[in-house]
From Swiss-Prot:
Major place of residence: nucleus
GO cellular component, one term: chromosome, telomeric region
Protein name: Telomere-binding protein 1
Subcellular location: Chromosome, Telomere
Sufficient for telomeric DNA binding, as annotated region: 506-615
DNA-binding residue intervals: 557-584
The organism of origin for this protein: Oryza sativa subsp. japonica
Domain SANT: 534-584
Keywords in alphabetical order: Chromosome, DNA-binding, Telomere
Pfam families found in the cross-reference section: Ubiquitin_TPR1
PANTHER family: TELOMERE-BINDING PROTEIN 1, TELOMERIC REPEAT BINDING PROTEIN
Disruption phenotype: Severe developmental abnormalities of vegetative organs and impaired reproductive organ formation. Chromosomal fusion in mother pollen cells. Increased telomere length and frequency of anaphase bridges containing telomeric repeat DNA.
Length: 633
């Protein structure tokens, strides 16, 4: 009975019958058998056909055997094949010229491969004996393939394994319906006796049973259109190759390649028994095919691009563009690594230091008032030159700490290449005499300056910094060329200097009484380590302030400064102005609300009177500067 084609299967072949389920058994470990050197049912059939065709070639005429009709060669049109009632699936690929070793194709056009292994057949002795008997019958009777056997069924159909179409089967092998060989075979078949034909049919049935009892390793093949030629090549490398020249009708039947990679064989023996109607269903649905195709694409991509061998490795990019930002970051990182490697490779331990300025010790210069500015510059220059000629001692400060041990290396002291060198400071200190005080240089040991240089000589004293060496905190450093320095208050000295005084340059006139004390200059840089000391006004200073305001007024604070506090440098005119406002406020409130040092009430009354008087004078003059008058008491 011929199965009808189903819409869901199309030209994919037969629908396999439902196989009844068997009780689940314990899993049994099956040993994998060697695939090489195995002989399968298809090889057995090819061997039988080889012997049959060899005997037939000897009987037939030689020159007309290998002729091929020109119409078939030119047209190559597909012809529907015959479908068998109980056919077994065949897995095949296109026959190549290089792979046709051991393949014998007769005048009927049957093509096959000879496998060189018979291990699978050796395991089944009954199957081997049956095969031998069939081969003997086929050898003795070359025309054993009768018309009514399983090969010569005339039921028209199309094998749907995706290989295209197979021409119609004749009585002996495969023949084209229009060929003259088919007519000759039919006439020979009709001329045979009935007994011989029945014997041949029985031998063919035995061969069919032998083939179906073997477990053929079948796999789904690629699809091909129904209009394709017989012998469609399904492998890429097989395209462009012609079939073996011994194939008469140019019919290429598919068979497995004989290499180790694609060889398929009888790995496990068949357990179907006598169930001749069962055909394994190896054609999956669309989902399985799509999944299989996606896995193939993924495997090919991994093979090209590289797989991840471990979690730490990165998957190599294959024909993918890297973003510009990421590429720039990687280039910058590589440059930094190269620079770091270059610096690390250098074995130089040189330390580069930049000295911008030195801190020199404090200089105390005494010069009379009638001296000129040029004489002052000359005196300072001579004093500094004398100190330098005498000798200086360089001190090193690292992060505010003095390094006293001269035997330490720079690395031991913390001065190396990799650290910041901005915290290193240098100081210049005077060398003291052996017989003198540590902070005094004896005048007899110094060079003298002529008396004609200045009108009255100056006294210059060189002192060393304090013991802690904290950047001359007790004796702050100075810059002699700093124009924004602040002078210390002048101290009037009435004592006569002697030969054992702290003078570098001796006096020209030892009877001089009025000497100017020129203090050390300060830099403009703010010293955050020092704060201005708060010095409250005393009663005497308040009395001087009130007296000056009574004579000069409340709007002339600079004049008040030079009149009453000229020699007091820690009192500025701003301090005097603020103190006057405080005194006015203190005098206007009750005594219980006053805070701070007590001020006599008499002075507070004078403050209120002077404030009222000068306010009235400014109102009368309408903004004109007030005339200095003595406030009436």
């Amino acid at each position: 009975m011929v199965l009808q084609k189903r819409l869901d299967y199309g030209s994919h072949g037969h629908r396999a019958p439902i196989k009844p389920r068997v009780a689940t058994l314990a899993p049994v470990k099956r040993s994998t058998r060697i695939r090489k050197k195995q002989m399968y049912a298809l090889d057995l059939l090819a061997t039988a056909a080889e012997k049959l065709l060899a005997d037939q070639d000897n009987l037939s005429s030689g020159p007309n055997i290998n002729e091929t009709p020109e119409g078939y060669v030119t047209s190559m049109k597909p012809v529907k094949a015959e479908q068998f009632d109980e056919a077994f699936p065949l897995r095949s690929v296109a026959v190549k010229k290089d792979d046709c070793k051991g393949c014998t194709v007769g005048c009927a056009g049957i093509c096959g491969f000879l496998r060189q292994a018979n291990m699978c057949l050796a395991e089944n002795s009954s199957t081997q004996n049956l095969a031998d008997s069939v081969l003997e019958s086929l050898t003795a009777k070359p025309d054993v393939l009768a018309k009514d056997s399983f090969v010569s069924s005339k039921k028209s159909c199309r094998l749907g394994f995706g290989l295209g179409t197979i021409p119609e089967y004749g009585s002996v092998g495969v023949c084209q319906p229009w060929s003259t060989r088919s007519a000759e075979v039919k006439q020979v078949h009709r001329a045979r006796p009935t007994a011989i034909r029945s014997q041949e049919d029985s031998d063919a049935a035995a061969l069919c049973a032998l083939v179906e009892t073997m477990d053929l390793d079948t796999k789904p093949l690629a699809e091909a259109s129904s209009g394709s030629n017989s012998g469609v090549h399904i492998c890429g490398p097989d395209r462009g190759h012609n079939s073996h020249p011994s194939c008469l009708a140019k019919v290429q039947h598919a068979a497995d390649r004989d290499d180790d990679e694609n060889s398929s064989g009888c790995v496990h023996p068949s357990t179907s028994g006598n169930n001749r109607g069962y055909i394994p269903h190896y054609i999956g649905d669309r989902r399985i095919r799509r999944l299989f195709a996606s896995r193939l694409r993924k495997a090919a991509r991994n093979r090209i691009c590289g797989e991840m061998s471990c979690k730490g490795n990165k998957l190599s990019l294959c024909e993918k563009k890297m973003p510009t930002t990421r590429r720039r970051v990687q280039q910058t990182t590589l440059k930094r690594k190269r620079l770091a490697q270059l610096y690390s490779e250098k074995s130089s331990d040189e330390v580069k230091l930049t000295i911008k300025s030195f801190n020199i010790p404090e200089l105390l210069i005494e010069i009379p008032e009638n001296a000129t500015v040029g004489s002052l510059k000359k005196t300072v220059s001579d004093a500094v030159t004398t100190i330098i000629e005498r000798g200086l001692r360089v001190g090193i400060l690292l992060q505010g700490k003095n390094i006293q041990n001269d035997n330490k290396t720079l690395r031991q002291a913390g001065i190396c290449r990799g650290k910041k060198l901005n915290d290193i400071g240098f100081t210049l200190e005077c060398e003291a005499g052996q017989d003198s005080h540590p902070g005094v240089i004896v005048p007899e040991e110094m060079d003298f300056v002529g008396a004609s240089v200045v009108d009255k000589s100056a006294t210059v004293k060189c002192e060393e910094p304090a013991e802690n060496q904290q950047l001359m905190q007790d004796f702050p450093g100075c810059s002699l060329s700093d124009p924004g320095s602040v002078d210390y208050p002048v101290e009037w000295s009435t004592q006569e200097t002697s030969a054992s005084s702290q003078a570098i340059v001796p006096f020209a006139d030892p009877n001089s009484l009025a000497l100017a004390n020129v203090p050390l200059s300060r830099s403009k840089r703010p010293d955050f380590g020092q704060r201005r000391i708060r010095r409250p006004f005393t009663v005497a200073e308040v009395e001087l302030l009130v007296e000056a305001v009574e004579h000069l007024g409340t709007g002339r604070w600079r004049d008040v400064k030079f009149r009453a506090f000229e020699n007091v440098h820690h009192r500025t005119y701003v301090d005097l102005k603020d103190k006057w406002k405080t005194l006015v406020h203190t005098a206007s409130i009750a005594p219980q609300q006053r805070r701070g040092a007590p001020v006599p009430q008499e002075l507070l009354d004078r403050v209120l009177a002077a404030q009222a008087y000068w306010s009235e004078q400014q109102a009368k003059l309408h903004g004109d500067p007030p005339v200095p008058e003595i406030c009436p008491t």
